[in-house]
C-alpha cells in the first residue's frame, strides 16, 4: 500500500530565492544616489559658473555671488578717449608744462604744484604750496588735481539755458535764486522735478574760470605763485626759450610781435597737452576695472562701496556720483556743484593771520562777480574723488592731511563739534569758525551724514569709515610713465 505525502506540492514558477527580494530596493537606491550625484555635480558646476561669471546668472544669484566674491554682477563697457600720438601743439604744451623758467623765481613750473607722480596734484603735504620770486610766499589754497578736467562743465547757476540767445548773466541767475531752499542730496535718488538754482562747474576752488587755457594762465601773474610782473615778461621768456622756433612753426613768423597772442597761444598749447595726453585721464583704476568685470574688490572695499552709496550712512554718492552714465562715460565722482561744509579755519595759512579775512569761495575774495550773492558765500567746488587717496592735503584751506581726518570730520562734525572747532571767549564751541556768522546758514545740515544733532549717534562706525577709505583707494589710477 502506497503511503500518501501530506506536504503540499510546490507550484511551478512560484518559488523566489530569499535574497532576490531586496534587489529592486538596491537598484532604486543606486538610481537615487545617481540622481543625487548628478544634481550635486550640476549644482557644483552651476556654482562654479556663477562664481566665474556672475553676470551670466539671474540677478539675485549674481548679486549674492558678487557680495561673496567681490565681482561685479553687472559689468559695463566704459567709453574712453582714443589714444593717439600727441599733436605738435600738445608736444609744445608739454614742454611749457615742465618749464620752471616761465616763473619769476626760475624754479616753479606747472608740474611743481601739479606733479604727474601725484595725480597732477601737490607733491607734498604743505597746507598751500610755496611760490613767489624767492619761493618763500605761501599760496592761498592747495592746488586741485588737473586730472579729468577735460570733462569739467563751464560755471553756471541753475539749469542750462539751452539755445536762448539772450541767456541771463550769472549774476542775474544768482539773484533770481535768492531765497530758494537748496535741495537735499541723497545717494541714488532722482533729482527733484523742479530745477534747483545751484552753482556748478568751472575751474579753481571757486569756479572763476571755465577753460583749461584760462586756468593755465592764472598762476603766471599770481604774486604767490609764478609771480611774473606782466604778460610782456612772460612773452619775452617764451621768445627766448629753446622751443621758440616751434612757436613760429605752429603760429606763424609774427607770433612774437603780439605779446598777448604769444601768451594766449602758449596757454592753448598747455591746454591741448592736458586734453590729449592720456595720463591726465586714464580711467585705469581698480574701480574702473571692477566696473568692466575685469577685477574683484576685497570684502573691505566692497563694504566701503555699499556704505559710499548708502543714503543713510556715508551718502558720499550724493555729491560724488559713483555710477557710469548712460553714454558709457566712467563716473567722475563729482556732481560739479558747490557746497558749504564749514571746515575749521586753518590758522597755519598766512592770510588767516588777519582775523577779519575769510575765504568765502564763490562770493570772494578771488572772484568778484558774485560777491553780492550771499546765499553762495563759503561754498566751494566739489572735487572728484578719483586719486584722492594719493593726496596729502584736503579741502580748500588744506586744514586736513589724511582721509582718516576727512572721514572723522564728516562723521562727527555735528554730533561732536568740539572735536574740530576751538572754544570762544565764552567757553562755547566756535562752530564753523571759518565762516562769518551771517553766512553760516549756508552750511549743509540736511544731507547725511550732516543731518545729525549734537550728542546723536554718528552715521558711521570706525570700521565703516575704514571700509570707505579702503574703497576710495580703488579710485587711484595706475601711476603714469616717468616724465
Regions from the PLM with identified roles:
Residues 384-483:
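Extracellular low-complexity, Gly/Ser/Thr-rich intrinsically disordered linkers
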Amino acid at each position: 500500500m502506497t503511503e500518501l505525502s501530506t506536504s503540499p506540492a510546490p507550484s511551478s514558477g512560484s518559488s523566489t530565492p530569499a535574497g532576490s527580494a531586496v534587489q529592486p530596493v538596491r537598484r532604486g537606491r543606486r538610481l537615487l544616489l545617481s540622481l543625487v550625484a548628478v544634481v550635486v555635480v550640476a549644482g557644483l558646476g552651476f556654482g562654479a559658473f556663477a562664481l566665474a561669471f556672475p553676470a551670466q546668472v539671474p540677478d539675485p544669484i549674481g548679486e549674492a555671488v558678487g557680495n561673496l566674491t567681490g565681482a561685479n554682477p553687472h559689468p559695463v563697457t566704459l567709453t574712453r578717449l582714443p589714444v593717439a600720438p600727441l599733436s605738435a601743439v600738445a608736444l609744445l604744451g608739454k614742454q611749457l608744462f615742465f618749464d620752471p623758467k616761465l616763473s619769476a623765481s626760475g624754479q616753479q613750473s606747472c608740474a611743481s604744484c601739479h606733479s604727474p607722480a601725484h595725480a597732477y596734484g601737490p607733491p607734498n603735504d604743505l597746507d598751500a604750496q610755496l611760490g613767489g620770486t624767492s619761493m618763500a610766499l605761501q599760496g592761498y589754497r592747495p592746488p586741485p588735481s588737473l586730472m579729468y578736467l577735460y570733462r569739467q562743465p563751464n560755471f553756471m547757476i541753475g539749469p542750462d539755458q539751452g539755445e536762448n540767445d539772450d541767456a541771463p548773466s550769472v549774476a542775474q541767475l544768482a539773484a533770481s535764486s535768492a531765497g530758494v531752499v537748496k535741495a537735499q542730496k541723497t545717494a541714488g535718488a532722482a533729482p527733484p522735478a523742479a530745477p534747483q538754482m545751484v552753482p556748478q562747474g568751472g575751474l579753481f576752488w571757486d569756479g572763476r574760470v571755465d577753460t583749461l587755457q584760462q586756468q593755465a594762465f592764472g598762476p603766471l601773474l599770481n604774486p604767490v605763485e609764478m609771480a611774473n610782473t606782466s604778460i610782456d615778461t612772460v612773452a619775452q621768456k617764451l621768445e627766448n626759450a629753446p622751443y621758440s622756433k616751434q612757436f613760429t612753426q605752429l603760429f606763424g613768423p609774427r607770433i612774437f610781435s603780439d605779446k598777448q597772442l604769444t601768451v594766449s597761444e602758449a596757454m592753448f598749447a598747455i591746454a591741448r597737452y592736458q586734453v590729449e595726453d592720456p595720463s591726465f585721464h586714464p580711467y585705469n583704476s581698480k574701480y574702473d576695472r571692477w566696473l568692466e568685470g575685469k577685477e574683484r574688490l576685497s570684502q573691505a572695499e566692497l563694504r566701503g562701496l555699499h556704505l559710499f552709496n548708502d543714503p543713510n550712512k556715508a551718502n558720499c554718492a550724493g555729491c560724488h556720483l559713483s555710477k557710469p552714465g548712460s553714454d558709457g562715460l566712467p563716473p567722475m565722482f563729482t556732481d560739479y556743484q558747490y557746497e558749504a561744509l564749514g571746515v575749521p579755519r586753518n590758522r597755519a595759512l598766512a592770510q588767516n593771520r588777519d582775523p577779519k579775512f575769510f575765504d568765502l569761495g564763490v562770493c570772494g575774495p578771488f572772484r568778484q562777480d558774485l560777491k553780492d550773492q550771499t546765499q553762495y558765500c563759503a561754498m566751494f567746488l566739489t572735487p572728484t574723488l578719483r586719486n584722492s587717496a594719493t593726496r596729502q592735503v584736503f579741502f580748500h584751506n588744506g586744514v586736513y592731511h589724511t582721509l582718516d581726518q576727512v572721514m572723522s570730520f564728516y562723521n562727527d562734525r555735528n554730533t561732536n563739534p568740539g572735536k574740530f572747532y576751538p572754544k570762544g571767549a565764552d567757553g562755547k564751541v566756535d562752530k564753523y569758525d571759518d565762516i562769518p556768522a551771517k553766512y553760516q546758514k549756508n552750511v549743509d545740515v540736511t544731507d547725511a551724514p550732516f543731518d545729525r544733532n549734537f550728542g546723536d549717534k554718528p552715521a558711521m562706525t570706525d570700521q565703516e569709515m575704514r571700509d570707505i577709505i579702503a574703497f576710495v583707494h580703488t579710485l587711484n589710477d595706475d601711476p603714469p610713465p616717468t616724465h
